[in-house]
């Protein structure tokens, strides 16, 4: 029984360590999402940036990426904006979705679960401030 108890204690410590690492990784991903939103607003004049997906719904895991929905980004600027987002997001992968071109089900998903990182209309999410997306 003693070996089992030691095994369980070690296992629980390992699980706690992994959870802490994952929380730190999610925090870094949120910081990067906020920086991407600020840079898209400054450089491309987007009107809105929303975080959605696992990072917005607290389902973040070791394979998660940063999912961002963007409004007001001209299509001709998409590749430049995506390149910038990709650069900032490293080591995370990033998905950048143009809301104007998104299918209705994706728009509904963003509306339902999304966290607004930047909204030209909203004072609290101005591009000069860090959006509060830490602990949703």
Mark where each language-model region is.
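Catalytic core of pol beta-like nucleotidyltransferases
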Residues: 1-45, 57-62, 73-136
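Short hydrophobic/aromatic beta-strand micro-patches
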Residues: 69-71
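Short gly/ser-rich loop at a beta-strand->alpha-helix junction or flexible surface loop bordering the NTP-binding
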Residues: 47-55
């Amino acid at each position: 029984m003693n070996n089992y108890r030691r095994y369980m204690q070690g296992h629980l410590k390992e699980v706690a360590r992994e959870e802490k690492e994952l929380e730190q990784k999610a925090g870094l991903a949120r910081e990067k999402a906020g920086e991407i939103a600020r840079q898209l607003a400054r450089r491309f004049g987007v009107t809105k940036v929303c975080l959605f997906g696992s990072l917005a719904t607290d389902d973040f895991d070791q394979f998660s990426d940063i999912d961002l929905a963007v409004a007001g980004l001209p299509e001709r600027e998409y590749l430049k904006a995506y390149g910038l987002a990709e650069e900032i997001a490293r080591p995370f992968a990033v998905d950048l979705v143009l809301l104007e071109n998104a299918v209705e089900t994706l728009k509904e998903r963003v509306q339902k679960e999304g966290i607004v990182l930047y909204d030209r209309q909203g004072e609290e999410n101005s591009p000069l401030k860090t959006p509060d997306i830490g602990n949703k």
